[in-house]
Amino acid sequence: MRRQLRSRRAPSFPYSYRYRLDDPDEANQNYLADEEEEAEEEARVTVVPKSEEEEEEEEKEEEEEEEKEEEEGQGQPTGNAWWQKLQIMSEYLWDPERRMFLARTGQSWSLILLIYFFFYASLAAVITLCMYTLFLTISPYIPTFTERVKPPGVMIRPFAHSLNFNFNVSEPDTWQHYVISLNGFLQGYNDSLQEEMNVDCPPGQYFIQDGNEDEDKKACQFKRSFLKNCSGLEDPTFGYSTGQPCILLKMNRIVGFRPELGDPVKVSCKVQRGDENDIRSISYYPESASFDLRYYPYYGKLTHVNYTSPLVAMHFTDVVKNQAVPVQCQLKGKGVINDVINDRFVGRVIFTLNIET
């Protein structure tokens, strides 16, 4: 490269005036100047730009060095570093020089506690006042809002899982738990207990009791003997031993509820789906298959302490055997809703009888 530069800069003849022997100093100076120019040109020519691959490799090396430095900086602290951290933490918890706990003095803590005490005390006082005012407007005896109370729901006894009564007449173990459930449920309806606690009311009319809402109300008698063949007094097995089961139905209590138009609510049972002849005979007790008006209205559990919910017993005396029979019992009366699709207990109840022999 140097030879090429010299050949470009040198004249065509071999000997130049710069190398004349008659002026050696000037020749040397010119020679040095030429050498410097040649070196600069050679440096400019010989500097080759780096390729992209080389630049990427250098960048990767720099990144690796930076990562190593960061890892070294984030490594496990030495014993002195741990000791310094413990000292800082202990000083934060308690600084004996400035007598500070958690970076606060005793006066600062006292002010904070005092502020929070008054804040929460005021909050509790406001809540207490609101609750007291609310309870002044609510009667514990009669519900304030009853417009959206649903019509009476119904429930049956004895209790059966998924409302499926499945038993074998010849195997007492399959129906004995139904008998035990009915006996336990009817203990509060014993004649002696009803005569002692409740009064004998005339049938066919409401038992309305005037007076203050906090006065105790009397309740009408509903004796166990009213259920006759389904009372468990004549047949201790409630018909389950003969394949003629008894099922009791009651309405849920609603404060102030009265059957409309003075007509008692009646009960009617039939096959829900399938052959209607699967149930050929049903006996009801009381014989009217209704809830007498004398048990209404209901005044609430605080004043109507001895109130006994009236019952209607369904005695399935002739039901097809050895197959599942879906049964639907509905309430019939003015203002009673019994066709709610999404609630199977409003005004009706659906259960299954499967009596095996």
Curated annotation (Swiss-Prot):
Keywords for this protein: Membrane, Nucleus, Signal-anchor, Transcription, Transcription regulation, Transmembrane, Transmembrane helix
Main location: nucleus
Swiss-Prot/TrEMBL GO biological process terms: potassium ion transport; regulation of DNA-templated transcription; sodium ion transport
Renumbered residue ranges of the record's region Disordered: 15-80
Tissue note: Highly expressed in skeletal muscle and at a lower level in heart.
Compartment annotation: Nucleus inner membrane
Source organism (scientific name): Homo sapiens (Human)
InterPro entries: Na/K_ATPase_sub_beta, Na/K_ATPase_sub_beta_sf
Family under the similarity heading: Belongs to the X(+)/potassium ATPases subunit beta family.
Residue ranges that the UniProt entry lists as topological domain Perinuclear space: 132-357
Keyword Glycoprotein recorded: no
Quaternary context: Associates with a SMAD7-transcriptional complex. Interacts with SNW1 and TOR1AIP1. According to PubMed:17592128, does not associate with known Na,K-ATPase alpha-subunits.
MF GO annotations: inorganic cation transmembrane transporter activity
Oxidoreductase found in the keyword field: no
Membrane topology category: Single-pass type II membrane protein
Recorded name of the encoding gene: ATP1B4
Domain of life, per lineage: Eukaryota
Biased composition (Acidic residues): 52-73
Nuclear side: 1-110
Transmembrane segments: 111-131
Protein name listed in UniProt: Protein ATP1B4
Gene Ontology terms: cellular component: nuclear envelope; nuclear inner membrane; plasma membrane; sodium:potassium-exchanging ATPase complex
Summary of the function given for this chain in its UniProt record: May act as a transcriptional coregulator during muscle development through its interaction with SNW1. Has lost its ancestral function as a Na,K-ATPase beta-subunit.
Coiled-coil ranges (or none): none
